[in-house]
């Protein structure tokens, strides 16, 4: 079962459409027990990190997400969903996040248009099944003003250049996190979802 986390925010409709387009079934849920019984979990995100963290904590989902990472249940976190996995963010002053991944979320540098809104290149830093059928340098769709800076550089799966060469994708065991929106990134975005589901579920749908 695929669980799509509903914490009162996030890009649920677009993500749901992407899952359906690939022929998979999912459950939209805010129930921690249901999330921890899933075979794969998607944590979407749009808007402010502080609001996302507050929404997760209000429903007890922060602890559920920490636990599923401990249990090595496959997790795909998107955009702000990725950012809140880290220790803290500069957004809104200094906001404490979930602390699942060591590192800080920083504002994009002065000198570039903020937010970054549009297509940009993904430079693959590792060979991984997540990238199967996706050429290095493929463009994906971004909407963000902040980026994650992991303390452990070994978890950086891909980078993107926008005033700074930033981490745009994390691979840490079965935790995948993207700064870009795969569900808004056309056929290659769907391919990334498909690769994630294949890693998590095998050939089941």
From Swiss-Prot:
Ranges where the Glutamine amidotransferase type-1 domain occurs: 1-205
Alphabetical UniProt keywords: Amino-acid biosynthesis, Cytoplasm, Glutamine amidotransferase, Histidine biosynthesis, Hydrolase, Lyase
InterPro entries tied to this protein: Class_I_gatase-like (IPR029062), GATASE (IPR017926), Imidazole-glycPsynth_HisH (IPR010139)
Active site: 79, 181, 183
Domain of life from the UniProt record: Bacteria
Reaction(s) the record says it catalyses: 5-[(5-phospho-1-deoxy-D-ribulos-1-ylimino)methylamino]-1-(5-phospho-beta-D-ribosyl)imidazole-4-carboxamide + L-glutamine = D-erythro-1-(imidazol-4-yl)glycerol 3-phosphate + 5-amino-1-(5-phospho-beta-D-ribosyl)imidazole-4-carboxamide + L-glutamate + H(+); L-glutamine + H2O = L-glutamate + NH4(+)
The keyword Lyase appears for this protein: yes
GO CC, any one term: cytoplasm
Single biological process term from Gene Ontology: L-histidine biosynthetic process
Pathway note: Amino-acid biosynthesis; L-histidine biosynthesis; L-histidine from 5-phospho-alpha-D-ribose 1-diphosphate: step 5/9
Gene Ontology MF terms: glutaminase activity; imidazoleglycerol-phosphate synthase activity; lyase activity
Assembly information from the UniProt record: Heterodimer of HisH and HisF.
NCBIfam families linked: IMP_synth_hisH (TIGR01855)
Record's function text: IGPS catalyzes the conversion of PRFAR and glutamine to IGP, AICAR and glutamate. The HisH subunit catalyzes the hydrolysis of glutamine to glutamate and ammonia as part of the synthesis of IGP and AICAR. The resulting ammonia molecule is channeled to the active site of HisF.
Protein name: Imidazole glycerol phosphate synthase subunit HisH
């Amino acid at each position: 079962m695929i669980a799509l986390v509903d914490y009162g925010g996030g890009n649920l409709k677009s993500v749901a459409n992407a899952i359906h387009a690939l022929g998979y079934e999912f459950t939209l849920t805010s129930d921690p027990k249901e999330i921890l019984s899933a075979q794969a979990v998607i944590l979407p995100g749009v808007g402010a990190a502080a609001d996302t963290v507050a929404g997760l904590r209000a429903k007890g989902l922060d602890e559920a997400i920490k636990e599923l990472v401990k249990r090595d249940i496959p997790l795909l976190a998107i955009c702000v969903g990725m950012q809140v996995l880290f220790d803290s963010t500069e957004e809104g002053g200094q906001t404490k996040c979930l602390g699942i991944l060591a590192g800080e979320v920083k504002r994009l540098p002065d000198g570039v248009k903020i937010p970054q809104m549009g297509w940009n290149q993904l430079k693959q830093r590792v060979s991984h099944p997540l990238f199967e059928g996706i050429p290095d340098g493929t463009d994906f769709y971004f909407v963000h003003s902040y980026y994650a800076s992991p303390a452990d550089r070994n978890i950086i799966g891909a980078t993107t250049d926008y005033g700074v060469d930033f981490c745009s994708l994390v691979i840490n065991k079965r935790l995948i996190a993207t700064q870009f929106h795969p569900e808004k990134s056309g056929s290659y975005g769907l391919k990334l979802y498909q690769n994630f589901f294949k890693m998590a579920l095998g050939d089941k749908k």
